[in-house]
Structures are given as C-alpha cells and as structure tokens.
A protein has these predicted regions:
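Conserved RecA-like ASCE P-loop NTPase motor core of nucleic-acid helicases/translocases
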Residues: 44-51, 243-249
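N-terminal pre-P-loop "Q-motif" helix
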Residues: 1-15
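SF2 helicase catalytic motif II
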Residues: 93, 102-146
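Conserved helix-turn-beta segment of the N-terminal RecA-like "Helicase ATP-binding" lobe
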Residues: 53-79
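Conserved two-lobed SF2 helicase motor
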Residues: 84-99
C-alpha cells in the first residue's frame, strides 16, 4: 500500500485528476483509499458503491484511519440522506437519480472514490462520473475487464496507480489459500412451460403458442438485457452463497 500511495501522490503531482487501483478482493482497497484520503486532506469526499452494506463497512474503516468524529461521516442511500457531512458514502442508485444530482454542484466534492469501478460503463455510474468535477477521482476494482468490451481504464486516463492480481496476492501471502468452486450454470431448464398460468408441454404447443414463446425468447436474448442480467448475477453471487432470481417478461 505504501507503493500505491506514493504512486497516487506522484500522479497528482504530475497534474493527473483520475487514477485507478486494480487490487484483488481482500487485499485492502478500502483501507488504501482511506489512507490516500488522509494524505490528500480534501474539504469534502464522496465514496460511491452499489450496496449499502459495503458503504457501512467503508465508513467504519475510514473513521478508523482518519480518526475523525462519526458526525463527519454520513450515509446517503434510500433510507438515509446525510449528504451534508464532510465524508459522504452514497449508493450509486440514489446518487445517480437526476433529481438528486441536481442538488449538488459539479465541484461539491474535491475527492471522489468509485468502488467496484468495473461497473462504471453502466448508465447510473456514468451519470455520476459525468456530473462531478473533483480535483481527484479514484476508481477501485478487482476485475477491470468487462465482457461487453467497455474500457474502464480509458475513463481514468489509463492511469493505473497500482495493480495486484489474485495470483500475486496469494504468492505474497496477502491472502489465505482457498478452494475455488466454479459455477457451471445459473439456470435449470424446465421440462414444460406455462401458458396463461397452465403447464404446457413444449412438444404439445400449438403453432401460435410456439410463435409467442419464440417472441418472448427473442426479447430475453436482447444483448443489452443479457449484459444487464450477467452484471447483476456477478454482483449478487460474489459472496459465494446460493442465489435465486426471479424474472418477469
């Protein structure tokens, strides 16, 4: 982390306003970002993430590192609107709403942290990133590569301040050894379908029912829909616990 902090300081000295940290899960991205905020000493900071649970843990870590009173840190999400604090921890879902962004000036925060920045190509993230003009913006991720080909590095000026992948983290004993269980599939094919709420064998469908089913399947296979679903599956399955999903079409 010392190397990363030195690199970040050097990038800012060179006039760069954006950088990205690629760090395997469990190697201390949150604490690293907190230490960088401590050395920058911004007037106001915004920390963006997808889940409120992540924000609450980050808030605890930042308070330990910064040594500031809890009253200086605030949660900005669906159930909490502490946007007037010095250090604001916000869900991207809440912050990206147009009516919410309209409440903040472009230079409201002079340091912005974007966690799980591999999602930055999503419209919600783009609205937040495009709206604000901080002195410095730091993106953090363990997996910068995206299946849709979007280049996250370009969003941050191709400034990789520090990179440590999973294999290197294991070799340097930064992480405990673990067993990896691959998930081969997320869905299970059913032997029949439901038409108007009734179970119908596929082979016994009428031509009209088959055409209707084909239309539904074409809509489900829309590339944008598929990418969105894959992104959500990856987010909610990261914890390694069994996940069930329900789709409406």
């Amino acid at each position: 982390q010392v190397e990363a902090l030195m690199n970040l300081a050097q990038l800012r000295k060179q006039g760069e306003s954006r950088a990205i940290i690629v760090s395997a899960t469990g190697t201390g991205k949150t604490y690293l970002s907190a230490f960088d905020v401590r050395q920058v000493k911004p007037n106001r900071m915004l920390y963006i993430a997808q889940q409120e649970q992540i924000l609450k843990k980050a808030e605890e870590s930042f308070q330990k590192v910064l040594g500031c009173p809890k009253s200086e840190l605030g949660l900005f999400s669906g159930g909490s609107k502490e946007s007037d604090r010095k250090y604001v921890f916000a869900t991207v879902q809440t912050m990206s709403r147009p009516e919410t962004l309209a409440q903040f000036d472009a230079d409201e925060f002079d340091y912005i942290l974007v966690d799980e920045v591999h999602h930055a190509a999503a419209e919600s993230y783009k609205r937040v990133i495009d709206h604000f003009q901080p002195n410095f913006m730091l993106g953090m991720t363990a997996t910068p590569e995206r299946t849709d080909g979007a280049n996250i590095f370009e969003l941050f000026g191709n400034n990789v301040a520090y990179e440590i992948r999973l294999q290197k983290a294991l070799e340097e004993d930064m992480l405990c050894p673990f067993h990896y269980y691959g998930v081969h599939e997320y869905i299970q094919d059913a032997p029949d379908e439901k038409i108007d709420g009734k179970d119908v064998k596929v082979e016994s469908m009428t031509d009209q029912e088959r055409n209707e089913l084909s239309r539904w399947l074409e809509e489900l296979a829309d590339p944008n829909r598929v990418r969105y679903i894959i992104d959500k599956i990856q987010i909610y399955s990261e914890a390694g616990t069994p996940v069930q999903g329900l789709g409406f079409f």
